[in-house]
Amino acid sequence: MHTRLTPVSSSADSTDSACPARPDLTAPHAPTASSPAATFFTAPAVDPAVFDAVPDRRGTASLKWDSAVKRGRPEDVLPLWVADMDHATAPAVTSALLWRTRHGIFGYSEPDDAYRAALTGWFSRRYGWQVEAEWNTVTPGVVPALALAVRALTAPGETVLIEEPVYYPFRDVVEVNERTVAAVPLVRDADGVYRRDLAALEATIEATGARLLLLCNPHNPVGRVWSREELAALEEVTARHGVVVVADEIHADLALPGFATTPFASLSEAAAAHTITCTSPSKSFNLAGLQVANILISDAHLRRTFRRELATTGYSQPNTLGLTACRAAYESGDAWLDALREHIAAARAHVEALLERIEGIEAAPCEGTYLLWLDCSGFLKAAGLKPEQLDEVMLNEAGLWLDDGRIFGAGGEGFTRINVACPRATLDAALDRLEAAVATVTARAAEWAGRGRVALSA
């Protein structure tokens, strides 16, 4: 059995007396739908120590922490796979949700003026991008929006472009909707940095007639924050061939210090005219379970086409608490998010330092997201193992539940993805397990080399 981490109380363990009093909704100072300037909460200074508090998420129906056995993993596995954080969300968000739950009515809701002002203010403030409120369509998530775009803009059998390795739902939403995937490989240079092969992309467009590209910006899992110059070069190719770009920018807020996300549609009005931008606070504020995403489409025809497809699903009003949380995050979450980005940068550096002790495993350079892409090819070679055996080592030897690189498509073999958005104690425990497992398996391989046996026990 592996050692369990000792949890501390999380900020969610609030007593009723800690809840903000429900505002008098008739009072002049109360937040109202017609008062976009009204804010839920004034954010205090952020204590970085909050990110190292160890929460206990077991027993909360957590996909990450409560589903190991159901999904065929060991019960005591340490989960660092799915992309949600082991950090409580921003206090501004918690405060707004507490206020909303004290109100006690959870009827149908729609984005109001305050929500729209928070959304447009966020993109103006954080990206210098002047988004118009009418561009936005709320959906229950970015992945559903990707699927909607595929269905709205292509016919069964037509080709959709993706760049692999990439977040695996990119391929899934194409294939489940009976379209054809054309995967253009990213190229890893001598420094381990992934680059786009524009010549290969253009050749694929010409060969397949594809008119839709799913872009991951920043890129999951390889950690690239595409530069403005790289995106401008991509824009030139896609515009020349009439390709609509569906930009998954869910990790945009998580560019690490020293890097900045450029929204693809912000390049120019011409770029925006053939772009569907998929955004959400779910990664940056840990709100995935509240199911709210904002899909920004400046072109009126594209927007109508997308909304028509959304209407066929029967979806109309968004999650009430999702709207509340998103508005609060975008109104008052800046300082907390900046502190989180610093914490993630430190976590990344800490993991990279610890990997120096582990022969045969190294992290690809990471510019954004809280996901590290680990190259385990050296370890596999030393241990005499095949890429398909890597996940078995992680689960049964290290007691770690990571994401096997093969699920991200071509180029993922021999890699694994680890989520570093967790307390330092969790990272230390994970790297200790990894170091011990690599040492054990490698030593076993050396011992058995003369016997013609494989390193993993039968």
Where are these regions (language model features)?
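PLP-dependent enzyme catalytic core of the Aspartate aminotransferase-like
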Residues: H2, A383-L385, Q389, V393-L402, ...
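N-terminal small-domain helix-loop-helix segment of the aminotransferase-like
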Residues: V46-G141, L148, S332, V441
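Conserved core of the PLP fold type I
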Residues: F106-E236, D253-A270, I276, A445-S457
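PLP-dependent aminotransferase class I/II
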Residues: P111, H274-G368
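Helix C-cap/helix->beta junction micro-motif
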Residues: N177, T208, R240-H241, A271, ...
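Conserved small-domain helix->loop->beta segment predominantly found in fold-type I
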Residues: D338-R341, A349-A383, D404-G411, A445-S457
